[in-house]
Every structure is written in C-alpha cells, then in structure tokens.
Amino acid sequence: MNLLAFGGGTKRTAKADAVITGAGSGIGRAFATELIARGGRVVCADIDEVGAAETAERLGDRALAVRCDVGSIDDVIALADTAEGWFGKPADLVINNAGIGTGGAVVGETSLADWRKTVDVNLWGPIHGCHVFAPRLRAHGRGGIINVASAASFAAAPRMSAYNVTKAGVLALSETVSAEMAGTGIAVTVVCPTVVKTNIFDSDTIADSASGLISTLVKWTGVEADSIARGVLNAHDRGQFYVVPQLDAKVIWQLKRLAPRTYTHMLGLVERAAR
C-alpha cells in the first residue's frame, strides 16, 4: 500500500526542468513520465542507452536521453553540462535514482567485485550527483534534490550487506545535504521504499538462491513505480524530507526505533530460518 499517492500539490515540481538518473526503466522512468505530465522537461540519464532513449521517445520533445555512468565523475559533470545547455539554465530538480540490487550471500561470501560494483553505482552515484549539482542549485537559488535510498538503509536485512550499506550511505548523505541546504531555497527529499515493481534486482549481483524469493516478493507485495513516483513528488512539493511510502517500511522504521533489541532478534530468526 502506497500512502503518499494521494494529495499534495505540484507547486515545486510543476514545469520543473529535471535531471533523472536511472531513467531508462522503473522508478526513474516513472519520475520522468510524471514530471512531463506536470509540464516539465526531463533529461533521462542512464548507462543503458537503449532504455534512456526509449523513455525519451515515449515522452516526446520535452525529454532528452543521455548516456551516463553515475560511477564516473566525468560522466556526471558532462550530464550536468548537457542538461544546462539543453534547458538553457541550470536544472530545477535532480533525482539521484540509479541503482542496482545486490543480495543472497552473507558477509565474507559476497564477492568484493559485487561490493565494488554496488558501491560504485548505489553510493558513488548519489555522491557524484550531489557533488556536481548542489553548487549549481545553490547558484540558481532554488530547486530540489531527491535521493532514492531504500528501506534497506535502516532495515539491515541479512544477506543484503552491500545493498544495505550503500543505501544507508545515501540516507546519511541526504541528511547531511539537507542540513547544508537549510535557508538556501533548495529542498531535499530522501525516499526509502521497500519492494517496487521494477527490474532493479535483475542483476548478476543477485545470487541464484535469492532470485526466486525476490521475484515472489515483487509479484505479491511490490507497488507500481508510477504510484511511488507520484507520491514522492507530492511529498517533495510539501517540503517533506523523509519519504517512507509503504506500510511495511513504516512498521520496520518504528519497530527498530522503539524496540531495537527485539528487531535485531527477529532478524536473527529470519537468517537462521533461511539457512
């Protein structure tokens, strides 16, 4: 159940010129579609050139596809320059959404290659995005940053160490940037969803032993990406920082804070049952 799709105006996101990473599919494509519906223009960035082009083609002449590897600072700088040139001004909104799923193995069995790949995309991506776009937004004097983290940033589920760590980093980065942007006219929002119906877990960093469970979760509990995107943009319009859109994530968020020992014990039971 998505609790955010209802209500909320479109003042901040109306007619926004936005840059979206990971816009070739999933939540990124949904953000682009919703922003176009709100009268904006979007730069659809993705390492998957075909996916980015498909998104832009669907959206018409107010969308531009750009290939970007968010793990490369040079690519992100080029993305910002391209967007500014196309818009004719700095972007109003930056959505650091690109990410990959990783899971299925315990610490010590997750390969270092998977760790590095996950950190490069999931953590360095938002770091690069904030590093490059934050100064431009400050100079612009208005706008916003939306960072897509995950409920994994606080849930700490077993066998998802690399994913958990990177998303926790995105949450901490967002909290820091929000404080640093206070009084500048720049709004910051961080999104912490659980299961969304996207292809993020269609990755070689997902162990075969976990792929079946993930597919089942997506099928039976996943929320549609367009519902998440709409709710997040509405929340950003309201100036909301933390966005925890689904009921299961809200329960985890509260349980961990109100009863941390109980929560940790429950995670241990889940891990033992999975062996």
Predicted regions and their residues:
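The beta1-alpha1 cofactor-binding region of Rossmann-like NAD(H)/NADP(H)-dependent oxidoreductases
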Residues: E49-V50, C68-A78, L112
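Active-site helix of classical SDR
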Residues: C130, T166
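Residue(s) in the substrate-gating loop at a strand-loop-helix junction
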Residues: S150
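Substrate-binding pocket helix/loop in short-chain dehydrogenase/reductase
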Residues: A105-V107, S111-R116
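SDR active-site lid
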Residues: G183-L247
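Conserved glycine-rich Rossmann-like NAD(P)H-binding loop of the short-chain dehydrogenase/reductase
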Residues: R38-E54
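Canonical Rossmann dinucleotide-binding motif of NAD(H)/NADP(H)-dependent dehydrogenases/reductases
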Residues: L4-V42
